[in-house]
Amino acid sequence: MGLELSAQQQASLLDYLALMRKWNKAYNLTAINDLEQMVIRHLLDSLSILPFIGSSPVLDVGSGAGLPGIPLAIALPHQQFILLDSNGKKIRFLTQAKIDLALKNIDIVHARVEDFQPTAPIAIVTCRAFAALNAILDSTRHLLTSTSRVLAMKAKQEDTKLPAGYEQVAVHELEVAFLDEPRLLIEIKII
């Protein structure tokens, strides 16, 4: 992956996983409980899109337990991230994670994506395990400008035609260390 993180960033990522494991008992944040698998399937998977995060703000739609938003925010402390979710329990977890990890570069928003009205243009929309590609595009259309990008993390390419007004920029094959499963990043813009 070629990723270089400081000792403090590495510690923050592990603290994040510890917090997720603690809250998972009551809040059902993830089906993955094994620490090694959490590192691979949550942290490394989320961080695999780092090379594609250029400008900010970055909106993490359907953030859930904060994936990929929190690992990206830890790795990119000078970028601004907005973590959006409609589930109150997940918002409580995200808020606590922001406090415990002292993440000053994230904002937590409790709303449905269709209802979210940002105060500044969104540069990048990320999503991981959120919805089918066309549903993602339909629900985020009002957030996109001509320079915005949607970065949809998928396990496989969907055989769907993009709605009118969208162009697929690229399909990036992601390499996640210790994971022998396909991971794709589908990059889309409006035209």
Question: Each PLM stretch: what is its role?
Answer:
Residues 137-147:
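A short glycine-rich, Lys/Arg-flanked "PGG" loop and its adjoining helix->strand segment in the class I
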Residues 90-92, 133, 160:
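Short alpha-helix immediately C-terminal to the canonical SAM-binding loop
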Residues 44-127, 137:
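Conserved SAM/SAH cofactor-binding pocket of Class I
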Residues 20, 72, 154, 188:
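Residue-level signal for inorganic ion chemistry
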Residues 147-157:
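Conserved beta-strand signature within the Rossmann-like core of class I S-adenosyl-L-methionine
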Residues 106, 148, 169:
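Short, conserved active-site loop motifs that form the nucleotide-linked donor/cofactor pocket
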Residues 1-55, 59, 89-92, 96-106:
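Class I SAM-dependent transferase core
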Residues 155-191:
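Active-site capping/gating segments
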